[in-house]
UniProtKB/Swiss-Prot annotation:
GO biological process annotation, one example: fatty acid biosynthetic process
Protein name: Oleoyl-acyl carrier protein thioesterase 2, chloroplastic
Similarity field: Belongs to the acyl-ACP thioesterase family.
Catalysed reaction equations from the record: (9Z)-octadecenoyl-[ACP] + H2O = (9Z)-octadecenoate + holo-[ACP] + H(+)
Taxonomic lineage of the native organism: Eukaryota, Viridiplantae, Streptophyta, Embryophyta, Tracheophyta
FT transit peptide: 1-48
Organism for this UniProt entry: Arabidopsis thaliana
Family annotation (PANTHER family): OLEOYL-ACYL CARRIER PROTEIN THIOESTERASE 1, CHLOROPLASTIC, OLEOYL-ACYL CARRIER PROTEIN THIOESTERASE 2, CHLOROPLASTIC
Length: 367
């Protein structure tokens, strides 16, 4: 039995009654039609009535939202400035620790940021480009990324990520994130980033014009809101240059085609993996990444060959006491169980810096 909802049959009746076409009656076998009450959304159906070359179609009768919008677990908050989305950790997103990798976390941060700006009407042709940016061939590129993970989600865990953006002076914009465990509401991570504008044709940085700023400021909180509100938090620490010779190295890293993004260069998440390639194996075996900070200094293209260098940060260079995100003071005992490293990514050909980094590792906990 063919079943159509009452809503759909009404649409069909109105369509034929309002049409100016003249339809030649066609004798067809009578088929029973039953109507039923819809419990959730009205049926999105397609019906065709063919005679010769003519075709009448009724489709997607309810809303103008796209299938992607209906499948996402994301929404703008009531203030209209921040955006939240839920993600389930999939099996291919976990690593040797049976938890999500830092690359997975970074990819989710990028995904929720892109979904946020797409939700408010920015273009999907590039990362959050406004109308003026598209006219002037301008794109956003990452200048700095700082991620702190207090607890890594495991396979099948659901993570809720909140994000928002705001102006960062005359040269760029800032985006922050807060990650929560959906099951407990516990904050399991925070992140912040700085973005600058680049001309897509010349590949040179460009100041943010008033016209572009006016286009995105309407979606930024009127008052500053920071994921790391403390003035002395580690996200603000300057990363010194790593001097030769480095203690650890991984030479000759080559970008894969899959590492390139829609901005025609190596995506910022790939740099995280390259930095970790030169971490000593004994640290990987006994520790997990707690904090990573990256300063992006130069874009990397597909034909570039990259060297990853790492050196332990000496105790004198490590701040022994920092105010934590909950207002507590980090104990020296806790610092003793952690390892700190400085990193640099540079071109193999001429030694030009691509990226500077700092990582902080804690002892693995038993699960």
């Amino acid at each position: 039995m063919l079943k159509l909802s009452c809503n759909v049959t009404d649409h069909i009746h109105n369509l034929f009654s309002n049409s100016r076409r003249i339809f030649v009656p066609v004798h067809r076998q009578t088929r029973p039609i039953s109507c039923f009450q819809l419990k959730k959304e009205p049926l999105r159906a397609i019906l065709s009535a063919d005679h010769g070359n003519s075709s009448v179609r009724v489709a997607d009768t309810v809303s103008g939202t796209s299938p992607a919008d209906r499948l996402r677990f994301g929404r703008l908050m009531e203030d209209g400035f921040s955006y939240k989305e839920k993600f389930i950790v999939r099996s291919y997103e976990v690593g040797i620790n049976k938890t999500a990798t830092i690359e997975t976390i970074a990819n989710l941060l990028q995904e929720v940021a892109c979904n946020h700006v797409q939700n408010v009407g920015f273009s999907t042709d590039g990362f959050a480009t406004t109308l003026t940016m598209r006219k002037l061939h301008l794109i956003w590129v990452t200048a700095r990324m700082h991620i702190e993970i207090y607890k890594y989600p495991a396979w099948s865990d659901v993570v809720e990520i909140e994000t928002w953006c705001q102006s960062e002076g005359r040269i760029g914009t800032r985006r922050d994130w807060i990650l929560k465990d959906c099951a407990t509401g516990e904050v399991i991570g925070r992140a912040t980033s700085k973005w600058v504008m680049m001309n897509q044709d010349t590949r040179r940085l460009q100041r943010v014009t008033d016209e572009v700023r006016d286009e995105y400021l309407v979606f930024c909180p009127p008052e500053p809101r920071l994921a790391f509100p403390e003035e002395n938090n580690s996200s603000l620490k300057k990363i010194p240059k790593l001097e030769d010779p480095a203690q650890y190295s991984m030479l000759g890293l080559k970008p894969r085609r899959a590492d390139l993004d829609m901005n025609q260069h190596v995506n910022n998440v790939t740099y995280i993996g390259w930095v970790l390639e030169s971490i000593p194996q004994e640290i990987i075996d006994t520790h997990e990444l707690k904090v990573i900070t990256l300063d992006y200094r130069r874009e990397c293209q597909q034909d570039d060959i990259v060297d990853s260098l790492t050196t332990s940060e000496t105790p004198n260079e490590v701040v022994s006491k920092l105010t934590g995100t909950n207002g507590s003071t980090t104990s020296s005992k806790r610092e003793h169980n952690e390892s700190h490293f400085l990193h640099i990514l540079r071109l193999s050909e001429n030694g030009q810096e691509i990226n500077r980094g700092r990582t902080q590792w804690r002892k693995k906990s038993s699960r």
